[in-house]
A protein has these predicted regions:
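Beta-strand-rich binding/interaction modules
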Residues: 49, 59-66, 431-434, 444-531, ...
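N-terminal, polar/Ser/Thr-rich
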Residues: 1-35, 109-118, 130, 134, ...
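Surface-exposed beta-strand/loop patches in extracellular or lumenal glycoproteins
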Residues: 39-58, 129-132, 138-147, 418, ...
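Hydrophobic alpha-helical and helix-loop surface patches within well-folded domains
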Residues: 175, 203-464
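Extended, low-hydrophobicity, Ser/Thr/Pro/Gly-biased non-transmembrane segments
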Residues: 94-197, 560-563
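Short acidic/polar inter-strand loop motif in beta-rich domains
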Residues: 97-104, 469-470, 535-541
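Long, ordered, helix-rich scaffold segments
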Residues: 349, 521-868
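A surface-exposed beta-strand-loop module
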Residues: 45-47, 51, 55-111, 510-526
């Protein structure tokens, strides 16, 4: 690299020298260039007559102070320094930018034929010179000018206050947002769309116009997004007492977008993946994803916009809290157990892996080179688990009291994680001093639990030891405050009430010490403990369960999550044992009692179908890899495929009967219908490994009247490498080649194809008319699937998978480093593999590091991996 990027540290935070109270923006949009005029009201905050503004890839055309041309300034690579300033002044900055050439998709850029923006975290500095930091909150007025025929819709934040015509076929619209906000929440869209309109009346009677803008021809795919938005608004009023505060709420769906969606005040910009759906183009998973993401961005209106972050190190303040809120929304509207299982799979798989990687960081990071790299599973998902632990410790009533106090203290300001914890502590009276360590300590704690039963005194003891391994960013670890939710069962399945010192005690144990013993009285027989119910803390659990105890919990646990977890622990025992067997050249085995336990689940008539589907799903290769300090990629893959084949063979009759019973003639996204489809397709995924697999999969594909069943058939054919795979893939491509979003599913299957020839398949797919490396969705679908969901081929000992990844990353480095940075993660953990693979991956990382123009996004990750 030409120069080494500098890190920023959380503890170096300084308030800004100046603040901006109001900004008036005018955008003159042309296809080859855009002129931006920014008129800001600036106030000195500290003794300084020098103002340093952020700015990147800008051409400065004019600079005025109080209407006069200003000469005392200098332009740096990423800043504008203005000197000799009065304490209060009007600053006018005119910049020229080229959205058409902006492939990084940060700031103002073109997506298809439309102009749109992405300003979080630091994109506004690519639009104009500004104090681009979240603790500078200004009121925005925005005028957008463009050609009327090409761009009939001109949108920005807030409420529309004026519009008019200009000569030469141009027109303008003026927007005003009365709520002060940081620059990252600014948004602008100009284009020609189809619009779905509705309205919502808030609990206080405010009429809110709802508008969803989609590409022409996609109006019939916007209905579910609108339903989800209305459900979100109603839910936030009912559960949190929070209502919307503008007269209009707009969502725009765009095809070129680095993230999932963005909560800009009053004008959300969404990746079209999280807006567009009908039964022909979207799966049940897509429908549920849209509901969750629409909810997430709407909930940010209070947790993120009304109260924002003081600095980017506090990102989890808005994201951890809002993920918790969107998870609760999905759980209240759907199946709480199934949603919880989905959340936990993410934590136990990729988030635990992130904790163990060279990029490990606490949910409130201390050191950052490129902020985009910290939009992570740790900050978001683990951040949400930290909020959930507070909810567990406080209970719903006190938690809501804490939320109200938080808004009372901080509405309209930029706050910190500490502010949130203090509000929870003060409102509840519960001491969270030790709990705060969750914000500053990285890594995954392990809880080692052992038990002793004393028959004479009828007492039962649980001894809990907690330990967090040193991580790449922190060597010293302290004991955390961990809520451990437990239940004890008598051998007949009855729940044993927890008592200590003659009094009832809570199911949630406060684990605070490195080693702690909890003693329970009046336990008349040796009990079976259900531990870490609801995954009450993001930790690894070690307890020496017997097969019989786990099978007992699969049947008797009152809590559905605990039943699922017992099944997962049972599978984990056999996966570990069989990995060792395979390494010693022995065949994979599964005990009859385990097969019978899963047969019982399949035949159970008192369990929700969607929950049964989860019970029957094996842990992923990525999750299993996380159990090992040295990963044997091939042995794990062989064991998982063999276990699936054994279960398919042994349970073929039951799977087949269930599959045929669950057929539905009409498609509906009611949760019961989704559950039946999910279980039916899990049965198909097993039956694909039996003699009837090929015929069954072909028949389902031919008869499918919805995308869920279509993709389930194709996935089964892909994973089991059935003879019909090629014809199904060909047929799908012919049908959908003109729809990039629908083709993403096809690209994902091509990238995850287990065939040893997969790289040839991927190279061919990259030539497909629907593919473009410039489109993040296409790239994530094809390349991301290969890197993250095709472990055997990605880690092929020839090194060709690594070389392919390196080639793609070098290409993306200059066009879209943010997408490159997301894709590189599987390479960072190279020390988990054998020496041959380590050397091959290291070679690719070193080639990247040696690039002259290596982007900060990649530099930070590559450097940490090589130093680890």
């Amino acid at each position: 690299m030409a120069h080494t990027p500098q890190a920023k540290y959380r503890l170096d935070y300084q308030p800004p020298s100046h603040t901006i109270t109001d900004i008036d923006l005018v955008f003159d949009l042309y296809d080859d260039a855009t002129l931006v005029t920014a008129v800001s009201q600036v106030k000195q905050q500290q003794e300084s007559n020098t103002l340093i503004l952020d700015g990147e890839t800008l051409e400065l055309r004019a600079l005025k102070v109080n209407g006069q041309d200003w000469q005392d300034y200098s332009v740096g690579e990423a800043s504008l320094e203005i000197r000799g300033l009065p304490s209060e002044f009007t600053l006018t900055v005119v910049t020229k930018i080229n959205p058409q050439a902006n492939t990084a998709l940060e700031g103002l850029y073109k997506s298809g034929g439309a102009f749109c923006t992405q300003c979080e975290a630091e994109g506004f500095r690519r639009i104009t010179y500004y104090l681009d930091r979240p603790d500078v909150l200004a009121r925005y007025t925005t005028t957008v000018i463009a050609d009327k025929a090409q761009y009939p819709y001109l949108l920005s934040n807030g409420n529309k206050i004026a519009q008019g015509e200009q000569e030469a076929g141009r027109h303008w619209v003026k927007w005003q947002d009365p709520h002060p906000k940081p620059a990252y929440l600014f948004a602008l869209v100009a284009g020609d769309f189809d619009v779905l309109r509705d309205q919502y009346v808030t609990q206080s009677g405010r009429q809110v116009a709802l508008e969803i803008f989609v590409d022409k021809g996609n109006l019939d795919r916007a209905g579910h997004a609108m339903t989800s938005l209305i459900n979100s608004m109603r839910w936030d009023e009912q559960r949190f007492g929070l209502e919307y505060d503008l007269d209009i709420y707009m969502i725009v769906a765009v095809d070129f977008f680095n993230m999932g969606a963005m909560e800009n005040k009053g004008l959300n910009i969404f990746n079209s993946k999280f807006v567009l759906a009908n039964e022909k183009t979207a799966t049940d998973t897509d429908y549920l994803g849209i509901e969750a993401v629409i909810g997430h961005e709407y909930f940010h209106n209070w947790t993120g916009n009304r109260v924002t972050c003081r600095d980017w190190f506090q990102l989890s303040l808005k994201e951890g809290l809002t993920v918790f809120r969107d998870q609760e929304f999905s759980s209240d509207l759907g199946s709480r157990a199934v949603n919880r299982i989905g959340n936990v799979r993410i934590i136990r798989g990729p988030q635990f892996a992130e904790d163990a990687s060279p990029m490990s960081h606490p949910i409130r990071p201390d050191k950052v080179i490129e902020m985009n790299n910290f939009y992570t599973l740790t900050v978001y998902e683990k951040g949400s688990e930290v909020i959930r632990m507070m909810h567990t410790l406080l209970g719903e009533e006190k938690f809501q009291r804490g939320m109200k106090l938080y808004f009372k203290r901080h509405d309209g300001t930029a706050a910190t994680c500490e502010d949130f914890v203090a509000a929870m502590e003060d409102a509840s009276g519960i001491d969270l001093q030790q709990f705060r360590l969750w914000y500053s300590q990285s890594g995954t704690p392990t809880l080692k639990v052992s038990s002793t039963y004393h028959a004479a005194s009828q007492t039962y003891e649980l001894t809990v030891e907690q330990h967090t391994e040193p991580t790449h960013d922190q060597k010293e670890k302290q004991p955390l405050h961990i809520p451990l939710d437990i239940e004890l069962y008598a051998p007949n399945g009855d729940v044993i009430a927890l008592q200590c010192n003659g009094k009832p005690v809570s199911n949630v144990l406060d684990v605070k010490q490195a080693k702690q013993t909890f003693r329970f009285e009046q336990v008349k027989q040796p009990p079976i403990p259900s531990l870490l119910r609801e995954f009450s803390a993001p930790v690894k659990l070690e307890y020496a369960y017997s097969d019989e105890e786990l099978i007992f919990l699969m049947v008797h646990a009152r809590n559905e999550f605990a039943r699922w977890d017992a099944g997962q622990m049972l599978l984990a025992k056999y996966i570990r044992t069989n990995v060792e067997r395979v390494q010693q050249g022995q065949p994979v085995e599964l005990a009859e009692s385990v097969i019978d336990a899963f047969r019982g689940v399949l035949l159970s008539d008192n369990l929700d179908a969607e929950f049964v589907a989860e019970m029957l799903s094996l842990p992923s290769h990525n999750e299993v890899s996380g159990w090992y300090k040295r990963v044997d990629v091939d042995a794990i893959a062989q064991v998982l495929t063999s276990l699936k084949t054994i279960l398919a063979t042994e349970l073929e009759d039951e799977l087949s009967a269930t599959y045929h019973t669950l057929k539905q003639d009409t498609y509906s996204i009611e949760h019961a219908a989704i559950g039946k489809r999910t279980l039916r397709n899990v049965c198909l995924s097993y039956l694909a490994y039996t003699a009837q697999g090929n015929a069954l999969v072909q028949k389902q594909y031919a008869q499918a009247n919805n995308m869920t069943d279509t993709i389930a058939a194709m996935t089964a054919a892909n994973q089991a490498q059935l003879a019909c795979r090629e014809s199904l893939m060909q047929d799908y491509s012919e049908k959908w080649k003109h729809d990039g979003l629908v083709m993403d599913k096809w690209f994902t299957l091509q990238g995850s194809n287990p065939s040893p020839q997969v790289l040839d398949v991927i190279q061919q797919a990259m030539q497909h008319e629907a593919f473009s490396l410039k489109n993040p969705n296409r790239t994530r679908s094809l390349i991301g699937a290969f890197l993250n969901a095709n472990p055997v081929n990605f880690h092929a000992k020839t090194g060709e998978g690594y070389r392919f990844a390196g080639h793609i990353l070098r290409e993306l480095n200059s066009s879209n480093p943010q997408v490159a940075s997301r894709l590189i993660d599987p390479l960072l953990k190279f020390r988990l593999y054998d020496e041959q693979r380590q050397a091959l991956i290291k070679q690719e990382l070193e080639q990247l590091k040696a690039m002259d123009n290596l982007a900060r996004d990649l530099f930070e990750k590559v450097s940490k991996a090589l130093e680890a």
